[in-house]
Protein backbone atom coordinates (compact mmCIF):
# COMPACT_ATOMS: atom_id res chain seq x y z
CA UNK A 1 0.00 0.00 0.00
CA UNK A 2 1.28 3.43 -0.91
CA UNK A 3 1.16 6.08 1.79
CA UNK A 4 -0.23 9.39 0.52
CA UNK A 5 2.17 12.33 0.80
CA UNK A 6 0.18 15.52 1.31
CA UNK A 7 1.59 19.02 1.00
CA UNK A 8 -0.40 21.44 3.18
CA UNK A 9 0.57 24.40 1.03
CA UNK A 10 -0.50 26.09 -2.18
CA UNK A 11 3.12 27.04 -2.92
CA UNK A 12 4.10 25.99 -6.45
CA UNK A 13 7.78 26.28 -5.44
CA UNK A 14 7.39 23.76 -2.60
CA UNK A 15 5.50 21.37 -4.85
CA UNK A 16 8.20 21.64 -7.51
CA UNK A 17 10.93 20.94 -4.93
CA UNK A 18 9.13 17.78 -3.83
CA UNK A 19 8.72 16.72 -7.44
CA UNK A 20 12.48 17.12 -8.01
CA UNK A 21 12.91 14.62 -5.14
CA UNK A 22 10.61 12.18 -6.94
CA UNK A 23 7.60 12.88 -4.72
CA UNK A 24 4.42 14.05 -6.46
CA UNK A 25 2.40 15.28 -3.49
CA UNK A 26 -1.31 15.66 -3.07
CA UNK A 27 -1.75 19.41 -2.57
CA UNK A 28 -4.24 20.58 0.06
CA UNK A 29 -4.14 24.25 0.99
CA UNK A 30 -4.95 24.73 4.68
CA UNK A 31 -6.39 28.27 4.45
CA UNK A 32 -5.09 28.75 8.00
CA UNK A 33 -5.33 32.36 9.23
CA UNK A 34 -1.72 33.14 10.13
CA UNK A 35 -2.70 36.32 11.97
CA UNK A 36 -3.99 34.11 14.83
CA UNK A 37 -0.41 33.35 15.87
CA UNK A 38 1.54 36.11 17.60
CA UNK A 39 5.03 35.02 18.66
CA UNK A 40 8.20 37.10 18.81
CA UNK A 41 10.71 34.25 18.43
CA UNK A 42 11.14 33.64 14.70
CA UNK A 43 11.95 29.93 14.97
CA UNK A 44 8.97 29.30 17.26
CA UNK A 45 6.76 31.32 14.92
CA UNK A 46 7.64 29.49 11.67
CA UNK A 47 7.41 26.10 13.38
CA UNK A 48 4.04 26.93 14.94
CA UNK A 49 2.65 28.25 11.64
CA UNK A 50 3.90 25.14 9.81
CA UNK A 51 2.35 22.94 12.50
CA UNK A 52 -1.02 24.72 12.37
CA UNK A 53 -1.17 24.44 8.58
CA UNK A 54 -0.32 20.73 8.70
CA UNK A 55 -2.82 20.06 11.51
CA UNK A 56 -5.69 21.70 9.61
CA UNK A 57 -5.09 19.37 6.67
CA UNK A 58 -4.38 16.35 8.90
CA UNK A 59 -7.82 16.79 10.47
CA UNK A 60 -9.38 16.52 7.00
CA UNK A 61 -7.73 13.23 5.96
CA UNK A 62 -7.67 9.68 7.32
CA UNK A 63 -4.16 8.63 6.34
CA UNK A 64 -0.84 9.77 5.00
CA UNK A 65 2.06 12.05 5.75
CA UNK A 66 1.18 15.73 5.88
CA UNK A 67 3.87 18.37 5.42
CA UNK A 68 3.31 21.97 6.45
CA UNK A 69 5.89 24.72 5.98
CA UNK A 70 6.23 28.41 6.67
CA UNK A 71 9.07 30.81 5.87
CA UNK A 72 10.16 34.19 7.20
CA UNK A 73 13.17 36.36 6.44
CA UNK A 74 14.83 38.16 9.34
CA UNK A 75 16.86 41.30 8.52
CA UNK A 76 18.29 43.46 11.31
CA UNK A 77 16.19 41.58 13.93
CA UNK A 78 12.94 42.28 12.02
CA UNK A 79 10.99 39.30 10.61
CA UNK A 80 9.24 39.54 7.25
CA UNK A 81 6.71 37.36 5.48
CA UNK A 82 5.10 38.35 2.19
CA UNK A 83 4.88 42.11 1.60
CA UNK A 84 1.35 43.50 1.59
CA UNK A 85 1.91 46.11 -1.13
CA UNK A 86 4.43 47.18 -3.79
CA UNK A 87 5.35 50.16 -1.61
CA UNK A 88 6.18 47.85 1.30
CA UNK A 89 8.25 45.65 -1.02
CA UNK A 90 10.30 48.65 -2.17
CA UNK A 91 10.97 49.73 1.42
CA UNK A 92 12.05 46.19 2.36
CA UNK A 93 14.40 45.92 -0.60
CA UNK A 94 15.97 49.24 0.35
CA UNK A 95 16.74 47.67 3.76
CA UNK A 96 17.87 44.35 2.27
CA UNK A 97 20.23 45.64 -0.44
CA UNK A 98 23.89 45.24 0.43
CA UNK A 99 22.78 43.55 3.63
CA UNK A 100 22.27 39.98 4.78
CA UNK A 101 19.38 38.21 6.40
CA UNK A 102 18.44 34.83 7.79
CA UNK A 103 15.73 32.80 6.06
CA UNK A 104 13.87 30.51 8.48
CA UNK A 105 11.59 27.75 7.22
CA UNK A 106 9.51 25.83 9.72
CA UNK A 107 8.70 22.23 8.79
CA UNK A 108 5.92 20.18 10.39
CA UNK A 109 5.54 16.55 9.34
CA UNK A 110 2.52 14.63 10.63
CA UNK A 111 2.29 10.86 10.22
CA UNK A 112 -1.37 9.87 10.57
CA UNK A 113 -0.55 6.14 10.52
CA UNK A 114 1.86 6.25 13.47
CA UNK A 115 0.16 9.22 15.14
CA UNK A 116 3.49 11.08 15.28
CA UNK A 117 4.51 14.63 14.55
CA UNK A 118 7.90 16.26 14.00
CA UNK A 119 8.81 19.96 14.01
CA UNK A 120 12.06 21.32 12.59
CA UNK A 121 13.45 24.61 11.32
CA UNK A 122 15.81 25.16 8.40
CA UNK A 123 18.08 28.19 8.69
CA UNK A 124 19.97 29.80 5.80
CA UNK A 125 22.00 33.01 5.72
CA UNK A 126 21.26 35.08 2.61
CA UNK A 127 23.55 37.84 1.30
CA UNK A 128 21.89 40.41 -0.95
CA UNK A 129 23.52 42.43 -3.72
CA UNK A 130 23.73 46.20 -3.43
CA UNK A 131 20.98 46.75 -5.98
CA UNK A 132 20.02 50.15 -7.37
CA UNK A 133 16.68 51.91 -6.86
CA UNK A 134 15.90 51.27 -10.53
CA UNK A 135 16.52 47.52 -10.08
CA UNK A 136 14.33 47.45 -6.98
CA UNK A 137 11.46 49.25 -8.73
CA UNK A 138 11.69 47.01 -11.79
CA UNK A 139 11.78 43.87 -9.66
CA UNK A 140 8.80 44.95 -7.58
CA UNK A 141 6.91 45.91 -10.77
CA UNK A 142 7.39 42.32 -11.99
CA UNK A 143 5.08 41.23 -9.16
CA UNK A 144 7.35 38.39 -8.07
CA UNK A 145 8.37 39.75 -4.64
CA UNK A 146 4.74 40.22 -3.63
CA UNK A 147 4.22 36.44 -3.72
CA UNK A 148 7.23 35.47 -1.59
CA UNK A 149 8.20 35.38 2.05
CA UNK A 150 11.19 37.65 2.37
CA UNK A 151 10.19 39.61 -0.73
CA UNK A 152 12.29 37.58 -3.20
CA UNK A 153 12.21 34.30 -5.10
CA UNK A 154 15.63 32.68 -5.31
CA UNK A 155 14.39 30.40 -8.09
CA UNK A 156 13.11 33.38 -10.10
CA UNK A 157 14.19 36.90 -10.95
CA UNK A 158 15.12 37.49 -7.31
CA UNK A 159 18.02 35.07 -7.70
CA UNK A 160 19.80 37.84 -9.62
CA UNK A 161 19.99 39.88 -6.44
CA UNK A 162 21.37 37.20 -4.10
CA UNK A 163 25.17 37.11 -3.95
CA UNK A 164 25.71 34.19 -1.60
CA UNK A 165 24.00 31.64 0.63
CA UNK A 166 25.29 29.91 3.74
CA UNK A 167 23.21 26.84 4.41
CA UNK A 168 20.55 24.97 2.52
CA UNK A 169 19.64 26.35 -0.91
CA UNK A 170 16.20 24.68 -1.08
CA UNK A 171 15.33 26.05 2.38
CA UNK A 172 15.35 29.54 0.85
CA UNK A 173 12.85 28.38 -1.78
CA UNK A 174 10.54 27.17 0.99
CA UNK A 175 11.43 23.58 1.87
CA UNK A 176 14.74 22.12 3.03
CA UNK A 177 15.09 18.86 1.12
CA UNK A 178 17.91 17.53 3.35
CA UNK A 179 15.87 18.34 6.46
CA UNK A 180 12.80 16.61 5.01
CA UNK A 181 14.89 13.50 4.27
CA UNK A 182 16.08 13.47 7.90
CA UNK A 183 12.51 13.86 9.18
CA UNK A 184 11.27 11.00 6.98
CA UNK A 185 14.12 8.81 8.25
CA UNK A 186 13.26 9.67 11.85
CA UNK A 187 9.71 8.42 11.22
CA UNK A 188 11.05 5.18 9.72
CA UNK A 189 10.65 6.06 6.04
CA UNK A 190 13.05 6.80 3.22
CA UNK A 191 12.51 9.28 0.40
CA UNK A 192 12.39 6.30 -1.96
CA UNK A 193 9.20 5.08 -0.23
CA UNK A 194 7.42 8.04 -1.83
CA UNK A 195 8.99 8.03 -5.29
CA UNK A 196 6.48 7.93 -8.12
UniProtKB/Swiss-Prot annotation:
The keyword Hydrolase applies. The active site is at residue 70. Its cofactor is a divalent metal cation. SUPFAM superfamilies: ITPase-like (SSF52972). It is an enzyme of class 3 (hydrolase). It comes from the Bacteria. It holds the Pfam family Maf. InterPro entries: ITPase-like_fam, Maf-like. Nucleoside triphosphate pyrophosphatase. May have a dual role in cell division arrest and in preventing the incorporation of modified nucleotides into cellular nucleic acids. Belongs to the Maf family. This is Nucleoside triphosphate pyrophosphatase.
Amino acid sequence: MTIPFILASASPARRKLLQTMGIDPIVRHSNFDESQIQLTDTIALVQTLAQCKAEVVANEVNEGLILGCDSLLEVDTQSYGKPESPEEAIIRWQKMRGNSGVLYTGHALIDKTQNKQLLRCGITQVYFADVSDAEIKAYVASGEPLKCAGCFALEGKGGLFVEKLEGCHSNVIGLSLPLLREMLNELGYTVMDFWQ
